[in-house]
Structure formats: C-alpha cells, structure tokens
C-alpha cells in the first residue's frame, strides 16, 4: 500500500495533462493571476501533436481564430511554426473558408514549453495523478441541509498529495489508454508513453461515469525513401494568412511542399484480404472511432464503389525525415502496413519509421458537465479536451481555454462565461457536447452551426475580443490594435457608401467590361461591391481603394458589404432566439405528451421543469430541434386557446 505524503505545495488551480487543452487552461488561469500547476506524465512531450502535425481546416480554423480572439495561444504558435499554409474551400463562400497550417511539430512543442516556463504563476511538474481528493461541504437552505462534493487536491502515483481549490482534467487519450497494432496491444496513452493509471477508478468512485472511444494515427515514412517525382505537388499558397489577430505575430519558418498520392487496386485488395487482422474487424475491440477521420480499411469497406482514395504526404518538420501519411491510418499488423504503403505510387521502396496504430481510451461523456465545463457531480472540478469525447487539437485548445476561464471565475465567485451557439463555434461545440449523448469522437464542422455566415474566421475578433479584454486575457496593446482595426473598418465602409462612380467614367466602363455588370447612371462603391463579379481587388486596380489599409480590413469590408442582407437576416434570427430565451414555460407542462420532442428531451424536461426557454436550452439532451418543436407546440396551444376564448366570448355575448 502506498503511503500518503502531504506536500507543502498548494495551488489555486491544478491542471492534469500537458496537451493542447491543458496548456491553454494552465496559461489562462496563470495569466488571470491564479497560482497554477500543470502536471504531466512527460514534460518533454508538452503540446505534442501525436497525430497530424497540422492546425486548422474546415470549422477548426474558425475555432483557432476564436481562441486567439479571446487571448489563447494555439493560433499564435500555429502561425509561428507553420511550414505550409493553404486556404481550403477558397472557391466557396466566406462562411466555409478555412486556413490550414502544416506545423513543425517539434518546434511547436518547444515553443509551447518556453511559453509555459516563462508564464508567471505557473509551475510545471512531471508526475502521474492517480487520485482526486475531495471534501464534503454542508450547505443549508430554509427547508433543508445539502451535502456537496468539493475538490480539495490530488494524489500522485508515488503518494504525494497537493492541495488545490480547482482542478481541470485534460488527460487526452491517456486514461486507461491501450494501443493496438493488429491483434497485439499494450497499455499506453500514445506510442512511447505510458497510460494514466488510477485516475479512472478515482472518477468512478466519485460518481463520474466513463466510457470508451477509439482513434488512430497513420504510419510515418522516411522522406529519403520516397520517389517524389512520381507525385503531385501541393505547395504553400497562403503563407501571408494568419490565425492570430495579433499584428506582432510573424513566421520565419521556411515554407515547404506537401505531396499527393493515391491508393491503388492492389492496396484495396490487400486490405480486403486482411480485414480480419485489424482490431475492429477482427473483433478485438468494439470502441467507436471518429466518423470524419476513418481508417483506410473503413474507407475501403464503406466506400466499396470507389476505385481510389487520395493520400497526402505531409512533412512533420524541417529537421526530421518523418513524413506523415495522411488518410492512411490503420490497425493492420506492422508487416502488412509496410506492404500496403508500398502499393502507393511513389512509395514502392519506402521505409516505415513508425507503424500506424489504433488507441482506445476512457472518456467522460460530457452530459455530466455544465456548459461552463465544470462537472455536475463535484464542485470546482472541470474537464476539457479529448477526455470530453472530442477529437482534434483545436477542439481541445478551445475547451481548455473555456475551462481555464470558468475555473478562475468560480474561484472569484463570478458567474461563468457561457458561450452560446449563435456567438461562436466554441459555443456550438460545447452545446453539442453537453446536450447530446455522443457515442463517437466529436469534431467541429461548419454544418453543425446554424449561424456559420455570422461565425466566420475573419470576424472572430469582432465577436470575441471585447470579451477577452473584459476577462483580462487581451492586454492593452492587443486591445488598442483591435480598436484601430474596428475604426478602419467603419471608416472604409462609410467611404465606400459615400463615394459615387458615374457610368460615363472610363473606370466604370472598364469595370463593366471585366465584370459583365452594367452600371446605370451612377452608383456608390458600396453598391458596386455588392455585385458578385466585382471585388475590392478591382478597386485597388483602378485606384478606387484605400491602399494603405491592412489586407484583413479590405477583406472584412468586402465580406460585410457583399453579404449584408444575409448577415442582417441571420442577426434577426439570433435576436429572435435571444428574445425567445425569456419566453416562460408553464410549470405544469407534461412533456411526455409532446411527441415531436426526442425521448431524451422529454425525460430531462420533465425531470428539471425549466421555467423559460433559456433554461431549457441548457439542459443536456435538449437539442435546438427540440426547442423549435417546443416553440411550435406552445404556439399551437396559444392559437387553440385564443380560438376557444373567442368562441366562449361570442357565446356569452349572444
């Protein structure tokens, strides 16, 4: 039996886990003036990118912009360590434009460690936390006495105890983690690192349920063994674009190319012949994997009609030979993996440096959390990142920031910051996690948001930087830069609105010819910019623009003007939802009688009996569709009531 040893060290906040959620949480609480300790099993692997060495992509880039707008760190580091950047969905509308950066994973980790080491109020500690320590606190109301569980500290594997007022668990895939290659498995949080022991049992003993999920990562191959001449090149095309709104952020990393290959019929045949050797199809594990990042064997089985799948070869850094084979994760045995890789064009003589593997792990279903990411069961215990059932560094970082903010607000006896669906992708993600009983790893998608035109990456600072400044995470320098940008946006919008162009002007005739858009009489530059084939770049070309403006302001003005009508409609919808949140719900409603509600919504609404729509929207299991159905049901009831009253009045008057 391990002897318990009390440490004389105590902290306001302890963060368990040094991944992307843990780093954001620890930096946030420390920046806000609270003594913080970040505990991790391996101090050399902080903010590691164990899967894809990339940040951003559809919806994920919007999350990164939002974290940065609030004062978080992931966007800055992604910008500083990017070795390739691209804009995805560039041919589509601005609601789905997405910046994606290939990063140097070792440089990313190194710079994060430097930031942590130089952050005031923050201590780093290498230890495995195996137990949460709690105390029971009695609270009294007029009619009753209640006992609540409250966090008081942690215990390490070797028995040392540390006290803390608040704890944030960001354990990633490490809780009872087990990695699989074929039918062989071993205990590990990820390749080369031991799993976290004891903490799962501690959570169970405190009444917190965990379940199991799976994810995976592809093999890494030696770039010296690849025939790049046989491959399509994917160059860096957006090195001048940034996740961060901080004008000081720069990138001095060399920009390099990725490459594209494809699976072949031989690849597919080899996979089909060996499906029985994979952990999932062989029946060795039954945990659910991520729907939007399937293994190569899943792709071959589920899309059997496809003859080929695109595979991306992505460098893991400037000073490493490792190439990440994106889109080729697998659970097949190691010898078959190499055979598979060699069926890909350009890789017929490749050397595999690290095999692909699947990892299954315990997670906390987030229906056990509040919208602040505090656990319902235990006061001052928060949970963030992959342990909440998400997948992705971006989702983890956003949750870490939110948990850090709300842990400090709870200690300051302030109300939590609740991010709404209509205000941010952060709010969309957390709302989805809390209200849905998810059975597979969750990733953020633009399709998950009803307000994606409003929640663009380019306007994340306009939406969230005032809040970041109010909280205390945005400093005076950033705040001044933000206000200057807002001023420029307003002034340029006004200039375009008040500057007219006559159809007789030579510039007008040139724009007509190039855009195919007729100018009659005269028009303002603002109205001209609303036309689909006219862009701010045309104004620059014909000296109608303010060329001294930052690119972000030019782009922001054009998007605001082009989509003004859509944005107003979406804002009206948001305002309507906000008004509806105050709409009262009669306490006597029997939700079982409303068959348009989901079964889970009926059960939870009957149990909690919310008094208004705002409260109902925060109940786990009650989706936006449920709220809409409830609103329609109430409207029908009101109409029926009005008709009945009208009929009675007519009867009485006659």
UniProtKB/Swiss-Prot annotation:
Keyword annotations from UniProtKB, A to Z: Cytoplasm, FAD, Flavoprotein, NAD, tRNA processing
One BP annotation, GO: tRNA wobble uridine modification
Predominant subcellular localization, coarse grouping: cytoplasm
Single GO molecular function: flavin adenine dinucleotide binding
Intracellular or extracellular location(s): Cytoplasm
Key word Oxidoreductase present: no
Amino acids binding FAD: 17-22
Keyword Cytoplasm (UniProt): yes
SMART domains: GIDA_assoc_3
GO CC, any one term: cytoplasm
Protein family per UniProt: Belongs to the MnmG family.
Protein name: tRNA uridine 5-carboxymethylaminomethyl modification enzyme MnmG
